[in-house]
Amino acid sequence: MSNRVVNLLVPIISIILGLLVGAIVMLFSGYDPVSGYIALWNGIFGDSYAIGETIRQISPYILAGLAVAFAFRSGLFNIGVEGQLMVGWFTAVYVGAAFELPMIIHLPITLLAAALAGALWGLVPGILKATLKVHEVIVTIMMNYVALHVVNALIKTVSGGSYKTDKIQPTASLRSDFLSNLTDYSTLHYGIFVALAMVAVMWFLLEKTKTGFELKAVGFNENASQYAGMNVKKNIILSMVISGAFAGLAGAMEGLGTFGSMTTQGGFTGIGFDGIAVALLGANTPLGVIFGASLFGSLKYGANNMPNAANIPLEIVSIVVALIIFFVASGYIIRVGLQRLNKKKEAK
Amino acid sequence: MSFLEVLYFIIPTSIAYAAPLIFTAIGGVFSERSGVVNIGLEGLMVMGAFVGIVFNLAFVDVFGGWTPWISLLAAMLVAAIFSIMHAVASVSFRADQVVSGVAINMLGIAIALFSVKMMFGKGQTDFIQEKIPRVNIPILQDIPVLGPMFFKSVYGTSVLAIALAFVAWFVIYKTPFGLRLRSVGEHPMAADTMGISVSKIRYTAVIISGGLAGIGGAIYSQTMTGDFGHATINGQGFMALAAMIFGKWHPIGALGAALFFGFAQTLAISASSIDIDFIQKIPAVYFHILPYVLTILALAGFIGKANAPKANGEPYIKGSR
């Protein structure tokens, strides 16, 4: 088997294993896994409404996945997508509500503001990593909690003590009557196009520009990049900033498309953490991220159908997602297994 | 409230908040000293909190007043078993330990919530009858000023937590096991050459961390919330991780950091009721973010990179240099 095939097989085997273990869990908990997975399937593809909602769910997942993947390519692990997403969400809603401008200016400015807010939240761990060698994983985790509390406090402030911000102006909204009608009045919005555009941006940036080459080089080997005359510090900071900008846009999807406002959050949205799964499954490539986001976005939305249709708690899907991450992370053992299988075949 | 009364309130509450963090952070010390990064502390704590509550609810008729204590043991056991997953992934399967830890976190909360919905048919459990009791420590409680601060109506678990820090210090620095643990975390190849089984030590360390985090979670749920739901632990595990780093991977340091974080959390929840002018004027959000901001500052300022165990996060592959 060539390396390429193995690289493709590892995520596929992980998904199968994850679903399999999920079925075993359902079986042992006294649920019927077959009707569970049928309910999941119908929750994703059942009718045009479900498909619309599923695609809507996929858009922030693509952006969160891009954020994690982009940082990974420069050797950085951005667990802070969750926090960057929240500040992006709040900023989008705030800018979207506070100004009255024609749509052609308002919407881009709002999206830009969300990206900037996320970028700012990524800048802090980036600078700390580049200048003081502080581990970005810890800083981004801490920044998540700072974001959670700060955003909640800001919502209270701007809404005058309430738990919810104002609705955004229609000129900043990503809502689309056309897409909504097409999918039986789902909340599908134009965000999916923004997300796909960003996939193209990431691909172009990484594969076709000098900056992208440097970012990847730093990810492969910092010392070699330094020796070749690249500015490693600048690239680390830049990578975190761009990663944060993607995450901020993911927040804008929720703010400008799905909800149109923001309520105080009791905990994290989970999209940022699932972004880690998306990136891992997609092997940190732009196209892979689309694939990973489609899978996890579908699973997450389809799960909502499971309590009603099959009477199974929807957390089963979170178990499956976590297991898939676990298996992808343990890819080494899958590779070993595949090699052994291969040798046996050759021996015959 | 006079200033002294404020202290009588804040100090015991801080220690109560710190106890789960101390247990979990010291669990983290064991794991990371052996060279296995354990971001999964949060998930392990969730597991402990969940098992503690469910066991307490199920067996309260059998064990009566002893229920919360036996629940702690049950939580320890289950979380320790759960942590084996992390050990297998990061030691035997050479997985990225941070990613595996993230999976443990997601899995912990998912399994706990799935089971809660299965058992109770709703998003959170019932409230437990027998919480961990508060006790007055005889004689010591009569000391003026200090008595009411430290020895009146304290949780038994808080005393245990502080004792654990010293036990952990003894184990890590004064026993052969501790020496092996640290050597495996600093230079696994050297340790291997001396005949120490790297994977055995690492497995043991991760399982200890799982057990301690489980106790930590069960203490939190059985003292603070009294039930289990999706927001019960909400970041305590990450806070413990921060305490471990803030405490420079040292049990006594972790103890100090955890006590400090307990204090910050107490301020956050009680700032509005404390009748001191300058505290009232500070918005609560600053207290909420204080532990996290301090951790970032501590990492940036006081703690150099050198303090982390050298081989932390690297799988040991025999024969490779």
Where are these regions (language model features)?
Chain B
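Short, non-helical or kinked segments that cap or interrupt transmembrane helices
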Residues: 29-51, 91-104, 180, 224-239, ...
